[in-house]
Amino acid sequence: MPRVCDTAYVSESAVIIGNVEIKGDVYIAPNTTMRADEPGSEIIIESGCNIQDNVVIHALGGSAVVVGKNTSLAHGCIVHGPCALGDKCFIGFGSVVFNCTLGDDCVILHRTLVKDVIIPARRLIGDGAVVNKQCIADRLSEVTVEDSDFVCRVVSTNLVLAKSYSKLRSR
């Protein structure tokens, strides 16, 4: 059964199935799907995350998806386990992340494929990139101050949304 902290906001149209843990101050937008329904699978969403509209998170049997603190999964992205995302990461619109480990503060922009690699902390992956070999992952550039500021703004905006929607629901 899913476990959801009482300070998290989960849209009524979100589908959360199986061994899923959602920690505090998390925003789960409409039409999100999280499935940890295969044997031995789990999904952990750490505090302060925002999971935007139409995101799909799925953990294969015997695997986990862990989304680090204050991480943003933007509209329509797919995160498929096994996968571990560090703290303060951003996964852009329509991106696919599968069988990966991302260090803290990584920014993956829109329509990107990241598969079967380990991404060091503070790396930037541009729009439409395909990172499916470790030699490509090892050559990624570092995020800029502007990239980090953008991620902080996204997290802050969605935390306000989560709190506002929670207040409306409790009326």
What are these regions (language model features)?
Residues 1-3, 37, 42-44, 53, ...:
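Glycine-rich hexapeptide-repeat left-handed beta-helix
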